[in-house]
Amino acid sequence: MNKNKLERVQQKKRILVAPLNWGLGHSTRCIPIINALIAHGFEPIIASDGLALELLKKEFPDLKAIELPSYNITYSKKANSFKLKLIKDSPHLLKTIKKEKRAIESIIEDENIFGIISDNRFGVRHKSVPSVFITHQLRVLSGSTTWLSSKLHQKIISKFYECWVPDHIGTNNLSGDLGHIEGSTSFIKYLGPLTRFKKLNLEPKYDVFALLSGPEPQRTFLEIKLLKELENYNGKVLFVKGQIENEQKIEVKNHITIYNFMTSKELEIALNESKMILSRSGYTTIMDLAKLEKKAFFIPTPGQFEQEYLAKKLHKENVIPCCKQDDFKIEMLETLKDFSGFKNEEYQVNYGKLFS
């Protein structure tokens, strides 16, 4: 056997893991999958762009990381303009998907890729390599055009080998109508919620943990509003901006401790040490808080139908209170006593079977 063939035999099977760079949720929910791949003898290669890529590089400094073409997804300043902005940006998105496909062809050849795991990146797939798509949105809400956006999304998903949904399959689920549809679902696998965190028995250190995330400019708008409101809060506050930068920065303003970002381990400890969480209603955040059985107050990203739906669903189920971004007042946190908070349903992802 020649040297090149011997190297290929001895080499661990390489799996490309590529989350979408839209907020930090797609990248953070890939962390337990990457850890599981390593534990099962695979060699993950990370591929993304922007903050999502930077976050995973900090979490896995020893893994190879590849930059993919950027979708450059941002929110409009006005919530009611979000759908129009997506329509306007669609030619750029389609061009980016084509660039992604070309990039994937090169990566597969150069890196000897055995499998692909794409978290909501449409162009990260290849007909010669088993490619799976991770999403909690089998149904994509878009107001009056939900039927169209859902059909288009399902058509894209059907081009993948499998679709992994990070939720429970039964009625006691987190994603509701988003992650559960009628009809042929033979290629859909329900993993159970994905989270990088564990529940720890720690004494409370913070009364409120304000955890920010999501695309600009809405992330900044929420940061400004919450910092102003929390000035008048009578309690100890931890505030994480969700800005991934080269160096961690910590600032203390009276009763508020402000971080630009935290590592996964720091977040795990901080969440466990906090009495209540103030955040967006992103699905990854919901999975994390369900695992930790936390109480939370949600402020959905303006104009994002998915987050608005999830917040209203959980409010209706008496799990959490929520409100619109412009309406939030610090006094609203007092309503948490009237809600149950999250309860965890024990489960374990069978990664061995999943990766087989």
Language-model regions, residue ranges each:
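Donor-nucleotide binding loops and adjacent catalytic segments primarily
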Residues: I34, L178, G192-M276, I286, ...
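A short, glycine/small-residue-rich beta-strand->loop->alpha-helix junction that serves as a flexible
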Residues: P19-I31, P217-T220
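A nucleotide-sugar donor-handling region in carbohydrate enzymes
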Residues: T135, V140-P217, V240-E245
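Leloir-type glycosyltransferase catalytic cores
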Residues: K88-L93, V319-S356
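Catalytic binding pocket for nucleotide-activated donors in carbohydrate/polymer assembly enzymes
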Residues: T285-I286, A290-M332
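Conserved nucleotide-sugar donor-binding subdomain of glycosyltransferases
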Residues: S81-G123
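Short amphipathic alpha-helix
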Residues: S27-L37, A52
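Conserved nucleotide-sugar phosphate-binding/catalytic loop shared by glycosyltransferases and other
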Residues: Q11-R14, N21, A39-H40, P44-P91, ...
